[in-house]
C-alpha cells in the first residue's frame, strides 16, 4: 500500500472518531468500537475492496458531519443521527455483512440504560 493510501485511511479514521464525539455516549461507544473493528478487519483488503470501503466510510463521515451541524443549529430539538439503507445497498451486502448489520441494529436500539439509576434500599458501608 502506498503512503498516500495509508495517510488517507488514518485521516478518515481520526475524522470519524472525532465526529463520534457529538453522538450520545452510548452511540459514541458503539460507533467507536464498530469503526475500530471494521478498519482493523479491512487492513489487508485488496485495492478494489479498500477503495469501496473508503468511499462508504467517507460517505458516512459526510452524513454524520451534516447531521452534527444540523443538531447544533437546532439545539432545541432532539438530535437525530443515521439514515435508512436503500434496498439496492442491502442487496450488495454479503451474508456476513447482513449479520453484522443486524447485530449493530440490535445493539443500537437497546434501551438506554445510561441514566437509569435505581436507589438501593440497603445502606452502603
Swiss-Prot record:
Keyword Zinc-finger in annotation: no
Please give the GO cellular component terms listed in this UniProt entry: mitochondrial intermembrane space; mitochondrial matrix
Identify the Pfam families for this entry.
Answer: Complex1_LYR_2
In terms of InterPro entries, this protein maps to: SDHAF3/Sdh7
Q: Residue range of the transit peptide?
A: 1-30
Compartment(s) where it occurs, according to its Swiss-Prot or TrEMBL record? Mitochondrion matrix
Alphabetical list of CDD domains matching this protein:
Complex1_LYR_SDHAF3_LYRM10 (cd20270)
Q: Name one GO biological process term.
A: succinate metabolic process
Provide the alphabetized UniProt keywords: Chaperone, Mitochondrion, Transit peptide
The Swiss-Prot or TrEMBL record describes its family as follows: Belongs to the complex I LYR family. SDHAF3 subfamily.
Its assembly, as annotated, is: Interacts with SDHB within an SDHA-SDHB subcomplex.
Tell me which PANTHER family the record gives.
DC11 ACN9 HOMOLOG, SUCCINATE DEHYDROGENASE ASSEMBLY FACTOR 3, MITOCHONDRIAL
- Function, please? Plays an essential role in the assembly of succinate dehydrogenase (SDH), an enzyme complex (also referred to as respiratory complex II) that is a component of both the tricarboxylic acid (TCA) cycle and the mitochondrial electron transport chain, and which couples the oxidation of succinate to fumarate with the reduction of ubiquinone (coenzyme Q) to ubiquinol. Promotes maturation of the iron-sulfur protein subunit SDHB of the SDH catalytic dimer, protecting it from the deleterious effects of oxidants. May act together with SDHAF1.
- The name under which this protein is listed is Succinate dehydrogenase assembly factor 3, mitochondrial
Source organism (scientific name): Bos taurus
Q: Which gene encodes it?
A: SDHAF3
Amino acid at each position: 500500500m502506498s503512503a498516500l493510501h495509508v495517510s488517507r485511511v488514518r485521516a478518515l479514521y481520526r475524522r470519524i472518531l472525532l465526529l463520534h464525539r457529538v453522538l450520545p455516549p452510548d452511540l459514541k461507544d458503539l460507533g467507536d468500537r464498530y469503526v475500530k473493528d471494521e478498519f482493523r478487519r479491512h487492513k489487508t483488503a485488496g485495492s478494489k475492496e479498500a477503495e469501496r470501503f473508503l468511499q462508504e466510510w467517507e460517505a458516512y463521515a459526510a452524513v454524520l458531519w451534516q447531521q452534527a451541524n444540523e443538531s447544533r443549529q437546532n439545539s432545541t430539538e432532539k438530535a437525530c443521527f443515521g439514515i435508512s439503507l436503500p434496498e439496492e445497498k442491502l442487496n450488495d451486502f454479503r451474508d456476513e455483512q447482513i449479520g453484522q448489520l443486524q447485530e449493530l441494529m440490535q445493539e443500537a436500539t437497546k434501551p438506554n440504560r445510561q441514566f437509569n439509576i435505581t436507589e438501593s434500599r440497603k445502606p452502603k458501608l
